[in-house]
Amino acid sequence: MAKGKYAANILKQTRKDARWKDTYYGRRVLGLNVKADPLGGAPQGRGIVLEKVGVEAKQPNSAIRKCVRIQLIKNGRQVTAFCPGDGAVNFIDEHDEVTVERIGGRMGGAMGDIPGVRFKVIAVNNVSLNQLVIGRLEKPRR
């Protein structure tokens, strides 16, 4: 390491070079996390329901988690989204427009015992899914 009177530039450049050894720094600066994200860095996204799917829970749990396969409007990518709530999947039909957000797993991954599912449905045809489940609102007829 340089210690002289005019060493500042060398020290600065060394720090700059060393930062690239950090994986998270490199991914952030090059925008790779946003590029790989189906929502493109946005907090929520809209999509069209392609089909309803049942995802089997991981061990030691035994259940079929009700999910929907959707195609995002903004970029055409297909993702699987979990439908939270008792009987929530019954309010969602094919070709409905749903709003999804991240499910909240660590490092942007899946949550709990639902493998490979990183999103959850929060609204169907611009009506809150939670309100539909508790019976406070009705789904609008198209």
From Swiss-Prot:
Transmembrane spans: none
Keyword set includes RNA-binding: yes
GO biological process, one term: translation
Xref: InterPro entries: NA-bd_OB-fold (IPR012340), Ribosomal_uS12 (IPR006032), Ribosomal_uS12_arc (IPR022863), Ribosomal_uS12_euk/arc (IPR005680)
Recorded GO MF terms: rRNA binding; structural constituent of ribosome
One GO cellular component term: small ribosomal subunit
Pfam families, alphabetized: Ribosom_S12_S23 (PF00164)
Signal peptide: none
Subunit comment: Part of the 30S ribosomal subunit.
Family: Belongs to the universal ribosomal protein uS12 family.
Protein name, UniProt field: Small ribosomal subunit protein uS12
Source species: Methanosarcina mazei (strain ATCC BAA-159 / DSM 3647 / Goe1 / Go1 / JCM 11833 / OCM 88) (Methanosarcina frisia)
Gene: rps12
